[in-house]
A protein has these predicted regions:
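Single conserved hydrophobic/aromatic residue that forms the stacking wall/gate
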Residues: 1-15
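A sequence/structural signal for flexible, mid-protein segments enriched
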Residues: 145-236
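Short, low-hydrophobicity acidic/polar segments
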Residues: 85-178
C-alpha cells in the first residue's frame, strides 16, 4: 500500500530520518568491509613482493699497479638461497655506481669483461665459477691451451642486504687484484734467424683454468700453453699471460720452440726451465717470470714438406705486445 506523505508533517519527517539512518549504517558497514578487504589484499601483495635494496658498488683500484684500468667490470650477485637467480651488473670503465636488487644475503664475484678469448664455465655457481682457455693444436699436433687475456677481479663470501633504511644505499666495496702472471722469454744462441718465416712456443706444466671465487688453480690439472713470439735482432722474444704453473707436484716445465724456415722446414727445440719457473716467489698462484733459454743452433735453409707458415687458426691466438727490458 502506498501512502502519500505530507512532507510538512512530523510523522513523515520521522520516517524519513529513520530510513536515512538505516541507509547510512549500511553504507558505513560496506565501506569498512571494503577497506578491510583492500587492506588485506594490499598486505598480501606487500609480503609477496620483494623489497629492493639500493647498493653503491665501489671499486678500490689500489692493488692494480702494473696495468691500466680495464674497459669495464662485471659484478655478479649470487643469492645464498637460490644461486640460479643471479643478478649481473656491468660498470663501464670500472667506475663506481648504484644498482638495485632484491633484499637478500649474497655472495659476490667481480672481474673485468674485456676478456676476449676467455671461456667462462659454471658461471651459475659461486663456488664452481671458472675462467678457462680454449684448446688448440700445436704445430706437432699436440693438444694444448691458448694463453688467457689479462684478468683482474675480487670476491666477497657474504654480503647482507636486508633491512636497509629507506633513502639510503648499502656500500659494497670491491678491491680487484691481478689474477694472471706475466711471463716473458728470450731465446739466445740461434743463428740464421733471417731464415725464420714463422714461429710458435709452448710451455708445459701450466694451468689453463682458474677458480674465480677461490682465486686458485685446479689441483689436478697440468697443460701445455701455446703462444707467439718474434725475432728481435739476434734473439727470439715473447710474452704472455698465464694463470700460473700447475699445482701438481713434480710436473716439469719444458719450453718448446717451433721454427719454420722460409723453405717450409720445421725445427723443434726444447729445454727444461722448471728451475726458472719455480725459483720465482709466488703470492698464491701469482708470480711474474722471465725465462732465459740458451741454444747452440742454426736455422737450416733446407726445404721441408710444408709451406713456410704454421697451419693454426689466427682466432686461436691472443698475442700480447710487451715491452721487454733485457
Amino acid at each position: 500500500e502506498i501512502v502519500d506523505c505530507d512532507w510538512s508533517s512530523d510523522v513523515c519527517s520521522s520516517d524519513l530520518r529513520r530510513q536515512a539512518v538505516i541507509r547510512i549504517r549500511f553504507s558505513l558497514v560496506f565501506i569498512f568491509l571494503w577497506i578491510g578487504l583492500t587492506a588485506c589484499e594490499h598486505k598480501d601483495l606487500c609480503y609477496d613482493h620483494p623489497h629492493f635494496a639500493t647498493v653503491r658498488v665501489i671499486f678500490d683500484w689500489t692493488k692494480i699497479s702494473n696495468h691500466d684500468k680495464p674497459e669495464g667490470m662485471r659484478v655478479v650477485f649470487y643469492p645464498t638461497d637460490d644461486e640460479s637467480n643471479t643478478w649481473i651488473f656491468d660498470f663501464p670503465g670500472g667506475e663506481d655506481g648504484e644498482v638495485e636488487l632484491p633484499e637478500n644475503v649474497y655472495r659476490v664475484i667481480c672481474f673485468n669483461y674485456d676478456t676476449v678469448g676467455m671461456v667462462w664455465k659454471e658461471n651459475g655457481s659461486y663456488t664452481l665459477f671458472t675462467a678457462d682457455t680454449r684448446d688448440v693444436r700445436s704445430p706437432d699436433n699436440r693438444t694444448m691451451a691458448v694463453t688467457p687475456p689479462w684478468l683482474c677481479g675480487d670476491h666477497i663470501d657474504r654480503v647482507i642486504l636486508k633491512d636497509i633504511p629507506g633513502g639510503s644505499a648499502e656500500i659494497v666495496r670491491l678491491t680487484p687484484v691481478n689474477m694472471v702472471c706475466h711471463y716473458t722469454y728470450e731465446v739466445n744462441g740461434l743463428r740464421g734467424l733471417d731464415r725464420v718465416a714463422d714461429l710458435r712456443a709452448a710451455l708445459s706444466g701450466m694451468s689453463g683454468s682458474l677458480n674465480m671465487s677461490g682465486d686458485s688453480l685446479p689441483a689436478d690439472l697440468s697443460e701445455s700453453l701455446l703462444f707467439d713470439g718474434m725475432v728481435s735482432r739476434n734473439q727470439i722474444i715473447g710474452g704472455f699471460y698465464t694463470f700460473g704453473h700447475s699445482a701438481l707436484e713434480g710436473e716439469p716445465n719444458v719450453f718448446r720452440l717451433y721454427i719454420k724456415n722460409r723453405s717450409g722446414s720445421m725445427s723443434v727445440l726444447e729445454q727444461d726451465v722448471s728451475d726458472q719457473v719455480h725459483d720465482v716467489p709466488v703470492a698464491g698462484h701469482i708470480g711474474d717470470v722471465h725465462l732465459v733459454l740458451n741454444f747452440d743452433y742454426e736455422v737450416p735453409s733446407e726445404p721441408g714438406n710444408g709451406g713456410p707458415g704454421f697451419d693454426v687458426d689466427v682466432d686461436d691466438w691472443d698475442d700480447v705486445n710487451v715491452d721487454i727490458v733485457l
